[in-house]
């Protein structure tokens, strides 16, 4: 629920988050209440296929799409398209792989499938993701490969895991601790060397009426990077030569 809270608090939006984790939902709604954001931010405990049928100006998907699986990936992207306003923007952050056959990448994938994320087989090369977006009628605006940043983030996760060794062992036992120690440590190396990565993709509906000038100019840049001051109406983006 952090993104839902942050966007509502700093950008003045009405934000809706969705997760299948009951404990996460309870935690997020408690934080929303503590920060006085009830009515501005909300987190629902739902399967993505049960998201209320309404329209959104912006949709963000943070490393959830790979868990949809290859079989359901196109249906998921189609659903995002249907939930997005015609002038809306879709931000997709998804774990991915480099293209081509690489033996270590195969071993990594088999390990992940068996021990960590069974069925999460939609961590794919970029071409697979872009093809699904375009097939759904979306237009890719920008793509950034943040694999090195991803590696640095996972290193923090690994450090936290090792710092909490005793409490994890007490709660889950040695086998579970060792599996995740190997997984997180291996993930740091895999992401750093380029075997796995993370793509950040911004897209919009591929419509003639979509205003593509919104991506340019100081104001448009601020739309993405500068927090909103509550009570102040953000300026409209302007085109610059």
PLM regions with names:
Residues 49-60:
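A short acidic, Gly/Pro-enriched loop at the edge of an enzyme's catalytic core
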Residues 28-29:
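Conserved SAM-binding loop
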Residues 13-20:
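Conserved SAM-binding motif I beta-strand of class I
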Residues 74-89:
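A short glycine-rich, Lys/Arg-flanked "PGG" loop and its adjoining helix->strand segment in the class I
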Residues 1-12:
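Conserved SAM-binding loop of SAM-dependent methyltransferases across substrates and taxa
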Residues 63:
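Short catalytic micro-motifs in class I SAM-dependent methyltransferases
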Residues 96-211, 220, 224-225:
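Substrate-binding/catalytic lobe of Class I Rossmann-like enzymes that use SAM or dcSAM, i.e.
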Residues 35-50:
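Conserved SAM-binding strand-loop segment of SAM-dependent methyltransferases
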């Amino acid at each position: 629920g952090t993104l839902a809270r942050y966007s509502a608090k700093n950008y003045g939006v009405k934000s809706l988050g969705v997760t299948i984790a009951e404990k996460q939902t309870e935690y997020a709604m408690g934080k929303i209440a503590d920060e006085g954001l009830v009515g501005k931010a909300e987190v629902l405990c739902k399967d993505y296929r049960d998201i209320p049928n309404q329209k959104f100006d912006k949709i963000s998907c943070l490393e959830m799409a790979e868990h949809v699986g290859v079989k359901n990936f196109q249906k998921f992207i189609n659903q995002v398209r249907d939930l997005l306003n015609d002038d809306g923007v879709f931000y997709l952050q998804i774990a991915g792989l480099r293209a081509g056959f690489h033996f270590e990448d195969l071993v990594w994938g088999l390990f992940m499938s068996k021990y960590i994320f069974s069925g999460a087989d939609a961590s794919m090369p970029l071409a697979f993701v872009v093809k699904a977006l375009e097939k759904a009628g979306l237009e890719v605006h920008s793509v950034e490969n943040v694999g090195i940043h991803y590696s640095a983030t996972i290193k923090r996760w690994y450090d936290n895991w090792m710092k909490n060794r005793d409490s994890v062992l007490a709660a889950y036992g040695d086998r579970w601790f060792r599996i995740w120690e190997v997984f997180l440590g291996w993930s740091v190396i895999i992401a750093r060397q380029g075997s796995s990565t993370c793509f950040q993709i911004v897209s919009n509906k591929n419509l003639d009426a979509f205003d593509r000038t919104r991506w340019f100019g100081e104001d448009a840049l601020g739309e993405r990077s500068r927090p909103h001051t509550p009570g102040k109406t953000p300026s409209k983006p302007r085109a610059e030569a």
